[in-house]
């Protein structure tokens, strides 16, 4: 299967370096065309030369559209370079590392078998219909017909579901990457939620994914490498060997799974579509 991987990056250059290595080393089920779009050049965040050999197309934007529009800018510019032969496009944050591509193959097959579904990613909010954009698989033909899917500022996850609704298109949840957040009333601390203000999990052992912002980890990227070894059940990063990986994965699954027992708004109130002010 022909799949384009559209990776966007601003300043997470080290994350990108390791992500590209992981893709080339462990994603073997499909034919991948890797596009990297960067908007950090004006601030000195250049793509290192040793990463270039893992990139099929590098798009460097001279200017950054800013905090509200930067993410949209990267996706819209990168989408211009998706090959005609690509059946699916995976949009990926530079700091989202996935061991192996079984999860991609699974949801590409499901999308192919579901005619009206064009997007697959995790459910983002409990209150609103919203879809994750850090790891999302999309039918490429839909992007070509509807480039506005990436034209957003605030609440990109809500924009996606609103846009799909308005174009009479469906989505599939990637349940292996759920739940993303703990309930908002968990305000002190929770295992595997390094930044309680965000209230977000950064490890997903079912999909063999880690997506940490390394500034939230005490030991930075070395700790992230250790988490990656745990979820992948490998010593992919030999410098960050972890013992008792199975026990650590059990703890991840337990604490993530436990949140399904916590009272949530969706238990007593239906999800709604968020009205986004332009």
Regions found by a protein language model. Give the residues of each.
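Active-site-proximal specificity loops/subdomain of glycosyltransferases
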Residues: 44-86
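C-terminal catalytic/acceptor-binding lobe
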Residues: 158-278
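Conserved catalytic core of nucleotide-sugar-dependent glycosyltransferases
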Residues: 97-166
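A conserved hydrophobic helix/loop-capping motif in glycosyltransferases and polysaccharide synthases
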Residues: 3-12
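Short beta-strand-to-loop acidic/aromatic patch adjacent to the donor-nucleotide binding site
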Residues: 86-97
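Short beta-strand/loop segment that forms part of the nucleotide-sugar
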Residues: 31-41, 60-63
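Short, well-formed alpha-helical segments that are part of the catalytic scaffolds
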Residues: 12-26
